[in-house]
């Protein structure tokens, strides 16, 4: 895979030996610069990737370089080699671990795919009415924290100050969350043997759904390589682990955001690129048609409303993401302006819809957002279409049911 632009290698010393392997992998040319000239070189060289050796002399130049890189478009990956301290928000950590070039090549290729995806979205945006979400992707990210050691509570708080957190005290619980949620990273903390850690990482590497997922291990030395391009060992205090894991998490969240935006473009702008569900306008149109057709042809139609604390907008977004992943292809829904999420279950009676809504609600309750541990506990109301209903009357009854349930 060749990239549209050179690789800018920033260092005050000699090139590490494993950098030569980039040529063999068709990741070239590599342009060298020192730290004092790095920010200017970004403008002049227009690189596709910035690779920086954190081997000394970088301290006064790191923040200006990170800011310059963040200003570039499309996305410019910034990989920091063997960083000892806390990194800027857009610097992807990479520990060379004895010069394993295969890991670096896989990391760069994964980042370059996201750069290409961003360029594709930017190219297609002018043709549509879709806009990229303006929020920092990290604000919408959700991370699975797996662990049961003494550092688990502090790590949960440190991550929770930056992203949404789903906690798991066992590998079995972690596997369940991996299968039911859209996650932007996994942090594997202490509390498991090296053998269990190895088995968990092996399973992740063998499943194509999780291969690009950032995986941060905090407690064990990694004795072998895994087919996980974004696997990183980050030991240390919880605050440092969270800060240095965040760039990898943000990159994955951005990739997911770009993928949803591309699907929205393909759907003519009727999908919300932030939630993955229909826009409010598209939902109103499709719901009116579904009610009309069900009344004319017969059959069942049920609706569920998941209402959240208006002060916890993140809970609504998490619920929308869960629903977009788990609901059937024939169902549809939208995040509403009042903070709720409404889902329509086609060809479904009240009893079945109530059972589905209860299961979906149980999945939503496992996320905490922010340092105050606000949890996603929805107030759920379910109703079904009757022969005398219109789309408006059914939604009105659903909202009234929710108000009574909340009072």
Predicted segments, located by residue:
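Active-site-flanking beta-strand signature of metal-NTP-handling nucleotidyl enzymes
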Residues: 142-143, 273, 277, 299-310, ...
């Amino acid at each position: 895979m060749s990239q549209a632009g050179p690789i800018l290698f920033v260092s005050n010393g000699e090139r590490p030996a494993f950098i030569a392997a980039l040529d063999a992998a068709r990741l070239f040319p590599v342009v060298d610069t020192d730290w004092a000239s790095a920010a200017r070189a970004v403008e002049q060289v227009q690189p596709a990737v910035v690779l920086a050796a954190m081997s000394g002399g970088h301290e006064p130049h790191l923040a200006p370089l990170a800011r310059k890189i963040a200003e570039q478009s499309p996305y410019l990956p910034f990989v920091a080699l063997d960083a000892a301290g806390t990194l800027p928000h857009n610097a992807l950590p990479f520990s060379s671990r004895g010069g394993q070039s295969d890991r670096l090549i896989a990391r760069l290729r994964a980042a370059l795919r996201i750069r290409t995806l961003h360029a594709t979205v930017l190219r297609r945006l002018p043709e549509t009415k879709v806009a990229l979400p303006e929020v920092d992707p990290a604000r919408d990210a959700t991370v699975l924290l797996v662990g049961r050691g003494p550092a688990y509570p502090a790590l949960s708080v440190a991550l929770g100050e930056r992203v949404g957190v789903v906690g798991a005290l066992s590998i079995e619980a972690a596997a369940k969350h991996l299968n039911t949620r859209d996650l932007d990273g996994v942090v594997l903390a202490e509390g498991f043997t090296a053998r269990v850690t190895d088995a968990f990482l092996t399973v992740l590497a063998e499943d194509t759904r999780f291969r690009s997922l950032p995986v941060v291990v905090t407690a064990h030395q990694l004795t072998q390589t895994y087919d996980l391009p974004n696997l990183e060992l980050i030991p240390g205090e919880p605050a440092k682990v969270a800060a240095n894991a965040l760039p990898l998490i943000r990159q994955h969240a951005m990739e997911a955001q770009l993928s949803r935006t591309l699907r929205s473009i393909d759907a003519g702008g009727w999908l919300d690129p932030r939630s993955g569900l229909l826009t409010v306008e598209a939902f109103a149109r499709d719901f009116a048609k579904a009610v009309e057709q069900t009344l004319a042809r017969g059959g069942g139609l049920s609706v569920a409303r998941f209402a959240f604390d208006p002060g916890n907008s993140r809970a609504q977004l998490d619920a929308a993401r869960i629903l977009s992943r788990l609901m059937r292809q024939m169902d549809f829904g939208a995040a509403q302006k009042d903070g709720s999420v409404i889902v329509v279950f086609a060809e479904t009676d009240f009893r079945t819809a109530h059972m589905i809504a209860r299961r979906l609600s149980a999945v939503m309750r496992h996320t905490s957002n922010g340092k105050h541990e606000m949890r996603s506990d929805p107030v759920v109301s379910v109703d079904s279409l009757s022969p005398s209903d219109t789309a408006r009357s059914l939604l009105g009854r659903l909202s009234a049911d929710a108000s009574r349930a909340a009072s």
